[in-house]
Amino acid sequence: MGLDMYLSKKTYVKNWSHQPAEEQHSVEVKRGGVLHQTINPEKVTYITEEVMYWRKANQIHGWFCNNTRELVDNVRYELEREDLEKLLSDCKQVLEILSTATKTTKQVVGGWKNGEEYLVDVEVYDNIDEVMEILPPTQGFFFGSENIDDYYKQDIEETIKVLQAELALPIVGYGVEYEYYASW
């Protein structure tokens, strides 16, 4: 259980009789090197790719909830390329702040032992008011930690890496749609 998050890209590949040959798409789906018997390439309309998967990166979930067009309440969001560019910019800004931030130790609930809560020390970033304005942790049932710590930073770094690669791809034609989906 927990917050599972997916960024997907759908590319429109339907062929029309009025399209010139150089604009036609060719789709092949193979399994074990053999054409898949239940998929008719002539009927394929979209190709859907998983751009990124996150696990309990609640600050990213909160960003999508607050900055994109909601399709299903708190679960599915429609995105434009510009949304990904903005998320990338925000992540870079947060990473820059964290690169110069000091750390401190904080006690948090570590779990239960003999029927009682116990506390553990965790290292967190200090003086992170700016980070809280840009990408604050988002609370939710099984959403993960609300600390600005090294795990938070790793989620930001991985998001930057994936979004930079995605946004570096050429814009070809039309028909590319992005969608964010979360479940918990």
Question: How would you label these PLM feature ranges?
Answer:
Residues 1-184:
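Acidic (Asp/Glu-rich) sequence patches and key acidic residues
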